[in-house]
Amino acid sequence: MQTLREKIENIRFILLDMDGTMFNAAHRIDAETADVMRQLMDKGYYVAAATGRGLATLQPLLNPLGLRFNAPSVGSAGGEVGEAGCVGSERLFTHAFPREELLQLLRFVLSVGANFCTDGIGRVFVSEAAGTDTYQFKDSRIAKEMGCAYPEVVQLHTETLEQQLGEGEVFKILIWHENDAQRDAIFDFLEAHPGIHGFSTARTMMEALPTGVDKAAGVQIAAEKLGLTPAQCCVFGDSGNDVAMLKAAGLSVAMQNASDDVLAVADLVTDYPNSEFGAARMLQKLFLSEE
């Protein structure tokens, strides 16, 4: 069995979740964190995101600090692998929902009173009842002010759901539920449909993906494009959609603010939460320290 030092010395590729990990409490990257990312890349490490967000939606989050990763990123919780923050750029990998199961799931989510948004290429759909104050609309407005590209954000109306979706691919569905009854009903639906799986990512949020898609599979694809293996990857995460990649990576780090299922599988835990530069401080300690 490898020692911790041996695991650290074997790492060539560092991938970080964004919300709750790389991002601060305001869901933005601090200048200090961006600087650590650049130092790692300057030192020869590959650095990228492994996020539940769609890759094309990251532009307004990366642009203010001029941060550009030097390796393929994992987006939509594993549903896509490609260049982070680039609308219209070629994807190295995508895995979309089967069409009929997608429609059934969206209709069921609405029928129990929950809301959703979808990640795909070209458009982001948000259920009508969720309103226009969700982070997708907020980030879209920020992107417009900055003059950078962002997918079109569209409110999806129940009666025209199928027509509005058109033939566009959907990689991931983020679901907001108000209570345990809604959550349990949606999990029961997922269990009855073998082509879809899901997990909780926060107290009132969950994600649904095509079966076989998760961040671990995405990390493996991104690593292989660089001629590396998951054993040469260090990953950081904080919530349910990070568990698979933490189990698969050579070195796994949970945030201090992580959920219990993440803390249970990680090799290391940061000394500080995401609101106090926890990921950046741990990266400095592991890979940039002179000790």
Model segments located where?
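Conserved ATPase-coupling elements of RecA-like P-loop NTPase cores
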Residues: 25-29
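Active-site phosphate-binding/coordination module
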Residues: 31-139
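Non-catalytic pre-domain segments flanking phosphatase-related domains
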Residues: 1-16, 35, 42
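Conserved acidic, metal-coordinating active-site core of Asp-based
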Residues: 108, 112-115, 119-236
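Short active-site oxyanion
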Residues: 44-48, 69-71, 172, 231-232, ...
